Amino acid sequence: MPSVYGARLTTFEDEEKESEYGYVRKVSGPVVIADGMNGAAMYELVRVGHDNLIGEIIRLEGDSATIQVYEETAGLMVNDPVLRTHKPLSVELGPGILGNIFDGIQRPLKTIAIRSGDVYIPRGVSVPALDKDTLWEFQPKKIGEGDLLTGGDLYATVFENSLMQHHVALPPDAMGKVTYVAPAGQYSLKDTVLELEFQGVKKSFTMLQAWPVRTPRPVSSKLAADTPLLTGQRVLDALFPSVLGGTCAIPGAFGCGKTVISQALSKYSNSDTVVYVGCGERGNEMAEVLMDFPQLTMTLPDGREESVMKRTTLVANTSNMPVAAREASIYTGITIAEYFRDMGYNVSMMADSTSRWAEALREISGRLAEMPADSGYPAYLAARLASFYERAGKVKCLGGPERTGSVTIVGAVSPPGGDFSDPVTSATLSIVQVFWGLDKKLAQRKHFPSVNWLISYSKYSTALESFYEQFDPDFINIRTKAREVLQREDDLNEIVQLVGKDALAEGDKITLETAKLLREDYLAQNAFTPYDKFCPFYKSVWMMRNIIHFYNLANQAVEKGAGMDGQKITYTLIKHRLGDLFYRLVSQKFEDPAEGEPALVAKFKKLHEDLTAGFRALEDETR
């Protein structure tokens, strides 16, 4: 063999010991079995083959290890080397995460595209997740030499962008006496900014820390969540609210609008920062997010317009990327979310979609010849889903100063054919507290968001009662009445189909008309208009109050008119005489929140008073 080939095809790297290597015995799709792996650990990261493909050990038997490889395994051969790294699959946490886009194992896609000049990720590419050469503005807190620090303490802030302050914390497993802290200035992620001494051993720290993705980051204690996650979608905020630190599932068939709801949450929710994981969905959806988000702006309380991308991190693992990395992408996303939670922020994590993640589990499980359970999914599917969702919650963070943070998980589920008895949907519903069920029939009627108000539920309504009492004491009663109207409409629909609308009692006709108002002009929302893409909570409350006020007044008028001689007040008469008020009720949604809260509340109050006056005049006329 010519020497040029000999130089290129060396089996071992010169600096590595031979004992660090195993060798490939079997390749089956993304699963590789390697021998000679004595001393390897579960979930240890390994490099497989001459291309240094990234893999993770998922089973150990004797000296052979089963490895799931996160890249395409075509071209791997028996006896190819497998290099052990002695560390678990970890993510890099530090300044520079926000506004970035990673793949499932935290490789920065933009950097790879620039370096390789290719539209696809080259195999075995090794690029650091965060740029180590960028300089960051480092501002230490009031700490000096001799001070004691413990895990989780915030010791500095870094200016990440004009929207987010990045708090630098000590890793959870570190502690000691400060022997050096860097003065304020510009530093890269390679520079030492803090040095601690503990039991005579000195340890230096940079602004960067690594954390294994399968291990939840420790917290001081878990707290009960009591603040609503305001999404800007009326049907979710008013009828089926979630909390900051809650768990939500959005199951629905194709074309029901799961991705649009996930994106609306990312754009308009009251979270401080958002981690959007595109897990096994179409690449075009991720491309759409990448095109939309940088152009989207959010208005801050001081009137500044800022790009939504400044508070967002994207983890893209589309359906044409290797299957095994889908499993890792969910863990990568939640670990990044926990990192921002530990700074005291409220974080939302969108997982779109957990079904694709479960399918990746099914494929790996099949390759390992494990006993399949329902629909071929592994028997531990529910346990894996639960261990992911339980990383959500509102917590008291480790270290000082005392602070609370939260991670809210919103998982989209794509059951085949919209069948909610699918194992992934069933397992998810037994875990999550909020269920936003999407309905294909509503989507076909172009009613968006297509959340079915008869099957959806939220178990957080009681936890949020104190918030609602403070915001508006009437809201809980109004919401109960609105739900009753929608339920009553569903009961009446069968009767209407049999005998027609005219045969109904006047009260039932009013119920049907109010339900139509609620359905078409309150629950339906147009995400592509400036006035309706985002609905503040005060607007949601006032719109519902006026619709229910109309319902109550109309019922009272009909009841009063029923027992009197002369002309009765009927539903037809109400609609004929008060047509202009009815039109104003329908048009409430067109009020633009950009006008400001005082202007909108004044308009809604005026309509409330006009409704009362209109019905009073109608009753006086018909006496």
UniProtKB/Swiss-Prot annotation:
Enzyme class: translocase
Transport found in the keyword field: yes
E.C. number: 7.1.2.2
Keyword Metal-binding among UniProt keywords: no
Origin species: Citrus unshiu
Gene3D superfamilies: 2.40.30.20, 2.40.50.100, Bovine Mitochondrial F1-atpase, Atp Synthase Beta Chain, Chain D, domain 3, P-loop containing nucleotide triphosphate hydrolases
Alphabetic keyword roster: ATP-binding, Hydrogen ion transport, Ion transport, Nucleotide-binding, Translocase, Transport
Biological process according to GO: ATP metabolic process
Binding-site residues, ATP: 252-259
CDD domains with a match to the protein in the record: ATP-synt_V_A-type_alpha_C, ATP-synt_V_A-type_alpha_N, V_A-ATPase_A
A GO cellular component annotation in the UniProt record: plant-type vacuole
PANTHER family: H(+)-TRANSPORTING TWO-SECTOR ATPASE, V-TYPE PROTON ATPASE CATALYTIC SUBUNIT A
Quaternary structure note: V-ATPase is a heteromultimeric enzyme composed of a peripheral catalytic V1 complex (main components: subunits A, B, C, D, E, and F) attached to an integral membrane V0 proton pore complex (main component: the proteolipid protein).
Family in the record: Belongs to the ATPase alpha/beta chains family.
Catalytic activity: ATP + H2O + 4 H(+)(in) = ADP + phosphate + 5 H(+)(out)
Role, per record: Catalytic subunit of the peripheral V1 complex of vacuolar ATPase. V-ATPase vacuolar ATPase is responsible for acidifying a variety of intracellular compartments in eukaryotic cells.
GO molecular-function term, one example from the UniProt record: proton-transporting ATPase activity, rotational mechanism
Protein name (record): V-type proton ATPase catalytic subunit A
